[in-house]
């Protein structure tokens, strides 16, 4: 295993250049194998979990879901606030920011982005809860692709470009996750569900996040600095793939639901009209049947 890891490190160095020494020795970052193994285990559970649960009763998980979602809401809020203050203190350039230009502020960003990387491992639990509760319809291609890819992408980001221009997407994503996990946490409480109105806007926010990240990343291509261009091109490509998947998810989830509701409403309206017409027509029948013929006067 050590020989394989050494060979892998040599390959990565030839492909991507030397690693950033500031994260040397950090948990899970020295060696890619643990991240890769976690991802493989995740995909195996996605595949085998629903099969295992097929003939079993779903678990409620309500109590642990409240705690889990509250924890991720607070972690996301912490990361968002720390990234915003770190960028402000380091006077980061929106258009392009190198990885070694802001001193201690760069280190603050790196520490927060490690938590961001680690949170992607924690978020595997999203899928596991879907499986345990038998909500398999929520395990979409978008869901699995996003969860499995983010952990691996951020392992590479943390080892080669752990600050600088890498901050933007993580900052937006942390803010979106504050909204998303607070929604999921509150929806675990049945009495709160009638008051939760912002689910649709979370998906819109995720789409907007991807578009804004492409715009900000493209600025680094148009007005380059010391941040490696290859990472920027990769970021743009990845965001385009997410936009395609999120757009498809949005259309499938909301436009079709809206069309279905309109169709049901029209059907109900037509049925109601027929009932009214039939009622009106039939209402004369008893009256007509009850009319007695007048007797002719016999004067």
From Swiss-Prot:
Please list the residues that carry the modification Phosphoserine.
285
Q: Which residues carry this modification: N-acetylmethionine?
A: 1
Q: What is its EC number?
A: 2.3.1.199
MF terms (GO), sorted A to Z:
fatty acid elongase activity
Q: Where are the transmembrane segments?
A: 26-46, 64-84, 112-132, 150-170, 172-192, 205-225, 226-246
Top-level EC class: transferase
One GO biological-process annotation of the entry reads: unsaturated fatty acid biosynthetic process
Source organism's superkingdom? Eukaryota
* Membrane topology type: Multi-pass membrane protein
Pathway listed for it is: Lipid metabolism; polyunsaturated fatty acid biosynthesis
Q: Which Pfam families match?
A: ELO (PF01151)
Residue numbers spanned by region Disordered = 262-299
Do you know which InterPro entries this protein is assigned to? ELO_fam, ELOVL5
Subcellular location(s) of the protein: Endoplasmic reticulum membrane; Cell projection, Dendrite
Listed GO CC annotations = dendrite; dendritic tree; endoplasmic reticulum membrane; neuronal cell body
Catalysed reaction(s)?
a very-long-chain acyl-CoA + malonyl-CoA + H(+) = a very-long-chain 3-oxoacyl-CoA + CO2 + CoA; (6Z,9Z,12Z)-octadecatrienoyl-CoA + malonyl-CoA + H(+) = (8Z,11Z,14Z)-3-oxoeicosatrienoyl-CoA + CO2 + CoA; (9Z,12Z,15Z)-octadecatrienoyl-CoA + malonyl-CoA + H(+) = (11Z,14Z,17Z)-3-oxoeicosatrienoyl-CoA + CO2 + CoA; (9Z)-hexadecenoyl-CoA + malonyl-CoA + H(+) = 3-oxo-(11Z)-octadecenoyl-CoA + CO2 + CoA
Q: Which UniProt keywords apply?
A: Acetylation, Cell projection, Endoplasmic reticulum, Fatty acid biosynthesis, Fatty acid metabolism, Lipid biosynthesis, Lipid metabolism, Membrane, Phosphoprotein, Transferase, Transmembrane, Transmembrane helix
Which intervals carry biased composition (Polar residues)?
Answer: 279-288
Q: What is its main location?
A: endoplasmic reticulum
Q: What does the subunit section of this Swiss-Prot or TrEMBL entry state?
A: Interacts with TECR.
Q: Which family does it belong to?
A: Belongs to the ELO family. ELOVL5 subfamily.
Q: What does this protein do?
A: Catalyzes the first and rate-limiting reaction of the four reactions that constitute the long-chain fatty acids elongation cycle. This endoplasmic reticulum-bound enzymatic process allows the addition of 2 carbons to the chain of long- and very long-chain fatty acids (VLCFAs) per cycle. Condensing enzyme that acts specifically toward polyunsaturated acyl-CoA with the higher activity toward C18:3(n-6) acyl-CoA.
Protein's name according to its UniProt entry = Very long chain fatty acid elongase 5
């Amino acid at each position: 295993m050590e020989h394989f890891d050494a060979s892998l490190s040599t390959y990565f160095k030839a492909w991507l250049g030397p690693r950033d020494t500031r994260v040397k020795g950090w948990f899970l970052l020295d060696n890619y194998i643990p991240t890769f193994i976690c991802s493989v285990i995740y995909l195996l559970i996605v595949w085998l979990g629903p099969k295992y649960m097929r003939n079993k009763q779903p678990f409620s998980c309500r109590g642990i879901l409240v705690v889990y979602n509250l924890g991720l809401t607070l972690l996301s809020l912490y990361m968002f606030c720390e990234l915003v203050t770190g960028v402000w203190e380091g006077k980061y350039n929106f258009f392009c920011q190198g990885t070694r230009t802001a001193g201690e502020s760069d280190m603050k960003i790196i520490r927060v982005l490690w938590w961001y990387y680690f949170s992607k491992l924690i978020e595997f639990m999203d899928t596991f809860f879907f499986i345990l509760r038998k909500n398999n319809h929520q395990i979409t291609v978008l869901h699995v692709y996003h969860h499995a890819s983010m952990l691996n992408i951020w392992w590479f980001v943390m080892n080669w470009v752990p600050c600088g221009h890498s901050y933007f997407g993580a900052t937006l994503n942390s803010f979106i996750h504050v909204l998303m996990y607070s929604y999921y946490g509150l929806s675990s409480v049945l009495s709160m569900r009638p008051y939760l109105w912002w689910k649709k806007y979370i998906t819109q926010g995720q789409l907007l996040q991807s578009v804004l990240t492409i715009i900000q990343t493209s600025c680094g291509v148009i007005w380059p600095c010391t941040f490696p261009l290859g990472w920027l091109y990769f970021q743009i490509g990845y965001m385009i793939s997410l936009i395609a998947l999120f757009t498809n998810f949005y259309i499938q989830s909301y436009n079709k639901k809206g069309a279905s509701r309109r169709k049901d409403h029209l059907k109900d309206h037509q049925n109601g009209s027929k009932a009214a017409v039939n009622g009106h027509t039939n209402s004369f029948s008893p009256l007509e049947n009850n009319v007695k013929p007048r007797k002719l006067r016999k004067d």
